[in-house]
Amino acid sequence: MKICRFNENRLGVVDGDEVLDVTEALSVLPSYEYPLPGYDPLIKHLDALLARIETLIKDAPRILLADVRLLSPVANPGKIIAAPINYTRHLQEVLADSAINNGVASFTQHIKKSGLFLKANSSLAGAGEGVALSHQDRRNDHEVELAIVIGKTARNVPREKSLEYVAGYCIGIDMTVRGPEERSFRKSPDSYTILGPWLVTRDEIDSPGELQMSLKVNGEVRQNANTSDLILGVEELVEFASSFYTLHPGDVIISGTPEGVGPVNPGDAMLAEIERIGTMTIAIRSV
């Protein structure tokens, strides 16, 4: 199932070029008192939510997908975990381009040496919200990635069981301000983590390591790769992340970008696509 959030926090199921409004299904979520939990309640109770949705779909109001404003399908992740260089060809382009590596040795190490990093939750936005470019005196780059949404609490999960802890998948855009500062700092301005266009539940993608992905800017193909080229695949990423962090429902792991990263400017439009997930268009604007 393809689950989306749209407009003023409405809940929808995507069916072709339409969205079925199933916001009523949110009634299955429990109410909370302060302090609020450190996980996403919708993802935590996804099974109950899906069961309720099934009872609503037949009579749900239908809206054209083109007429809705898509928000991030995960509203409250406990953390956003990001993978640095996780494609060999991306490592090669980083080594070759001083505008990317800025002469910092740690920026030219692949994931097995550099580990993972965190992005600020406040950087999260949906496809319909677009990207507000920060620090336009610097180069701002796009990076398309497969995003993994954790479905249940996980700690020290072996790779052979790791997919059991996944709720589903999205397209992720990891925007980056180029410079010498630490990755987390340069990748965490507001709207620099785009998640969307919706959450595709795990049952619809049995082989996340075999997905074709691409990104175009103003119609020009910039990135085109397959998740089979990941250095650490989805299973290994969940294993690796859970060996350092306790993963909670709604935590997001963005798996790293392939080669072809490049700059964007206000007025540009990015079209990102991942096989079996869908496509999303993201507008670039000034802050």
Swiss-Prot record:
Transmembrane segments: none
InterPro entries, A to Z: Fumarylacetoacetase-like_C, Fumarylacetoacetase_C_sf
Reaction catalysis annotation: 3-maleylpyruvate + H2O = maleate + pyruvate + H(+)
UniProt keyword Transmembrane, yes or no: no
Protein activity control: Activated by Mn(2+). Inhibited by Ni(2+), Cd(2+), Co(2+) or Cu(2+).
Superkingdom as given in the UniProt entry: Bacteria
Broadest EC class assigned to this enzyme: hydrolase
Residues reported in the UniProt entry to bind a divalent metal cation: E143, E145, D174
An example molecular function term from Gene Ontology annotations: metal ion binding
Pfam family for this entry, one: FAA_hydrolase
Induction: Induced by 3-hydroxybenzoate.
pH dependence of activity: Optimum pH is 7.2-7.7. Optimum pH is 7.6.
Null mutant phenotype: Disruption mutant can still grow on gentisate.
EC number: 3.7.1.23
Family assignment from sequence similarity: Belongs to the FAH family.
Free-text function comment from the UniProt entry: Involved in the degradation of gentisate. Catalyzes the hydrolysis of 3-maleylpyruvate, the ring-cleavage product of gentisate.
Subunit structure: Homodimer.
Protein name from the UniProt record: Maleylpyruvate hydrolase
Gene giving rise to this polypeptide: hbzF
